[in-house]
Amino acid sequence: MTHPQQPAEPLYCPPCTPGQVERSATIDLDALEHNVRRLKELIGDRALIAVIKADAYGHGAYPVARSAIAAGADLLGVVHVNEALQLRADGIDAPLMAWLHTPSTDFEAALQEKIRLGVSGWDLEAVAAAAERTGERAIVHLKADTGLGRNG
């Protein structure tokens, strides 16, 4: 498998405050693949989700997604449906899940692209309506606040 020599350009890079040093991090895709394979060995037949939200934390969602899937990740996780739709447009056909939705989230497009959805109670009606309109089956992961004050 070949990998780009340069990390992908981040989606947004705020300018440095005068006097600050610009920071960067580089992902070694071979090391990432090694780590995913090792995790799969440790967890056996359990599913492994590789979270690549926010453009893989600015490292390039597409190359990180390809490497994670090639090494055995079962599912890719992103925050927003638009991130998942971009991965589909880029040719990633692996299972994808998005879990943070806004009133403008395009659930119809998500269902048509077979994107799994992490949903709370208030998302269920919108997802069910989108499934009815598209004729697509929605695969949902229910989110619950377990006391941390977070919904996930």
Predicted regions and their residues:
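N-terminal amphipathic/basic leader segments beginning at the initiator methionine
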Residues: 2-18
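Active-site-proximal beta-alpha core segment in soluble small-molecule metabolic enzymes
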Residues: 12-13, 19, 23-27, 31-34, ...
